């Protein structure tokens, strides 16, 4: 199963997210320290980083950038209770707090789903010469 790294300065949020995702079979790592999150991402494969945007030690968008520098295959989901302009500017997937377990799990599944191949339209059938 996929490994998800949850980073939030609020321990209660990390606990809730961990509980929601482990119930669905995900392996969840967590930390409140963005620097530790970067170290964790370099030490083992992390499929998805879920990070709060507004944290005192480092913004979530900066953490996402730095994790993807050391682990380019790691996908990112930003979360925040605030409307932050840099969320939109980042172009990264986002889920607003508070969220339901179903909303979080659905968002995680969407992000981790393998890409679907581009469906090319069938060429038109040639018309027989009349």
Predicted regions and their residues:
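Two-component/phosphorelay signaling modules centered on CheY-like receiver
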Residues: 11-29
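Acidic catalytic/metal-coordinating carboxylates
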Residues: 32-36, 59-63
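Conserved phosphotransfer cores of two-component systems
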Residues: 42-44, 66-74, 83-87
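Active-site residues of response regulator receiver
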Residues: 52
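Receiver (REC) domain active-site loop signature in two-component systems and cognate sites
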Residues: 55
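C-terminal output helix
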Residues: 99-112, 116
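CheY-like receiver
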Residues: 115-130
């Amino acid at each position: 199963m996929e490994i998800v790294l949850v980073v939030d300065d609020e321990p209660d949020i990390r606990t809730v997210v961990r509980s929601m995702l482990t119930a669905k079979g995900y392996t969840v790592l967590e930390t409140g320290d963005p620097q530790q999150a970067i170290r964790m991402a370099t030490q083992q494969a992390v499929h998805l980083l879920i990070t709060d945007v507004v944290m005192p030690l480092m913004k979530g968008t900066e953490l996402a950038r730095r994790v993807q520098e050391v682990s380019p295959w790691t996908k990112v989901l930003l979360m925040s209770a605030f409307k932050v302009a840099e969320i939109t500017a980042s172009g990264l997937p986002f889920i607003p707090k508070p969220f339901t377990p179903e909303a979080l799990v659905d968002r995680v599944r969407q992000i981790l789903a393998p890409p679907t191949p581009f469906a090319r339209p069938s060429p038109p059938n040639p018309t027989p010469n009349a």
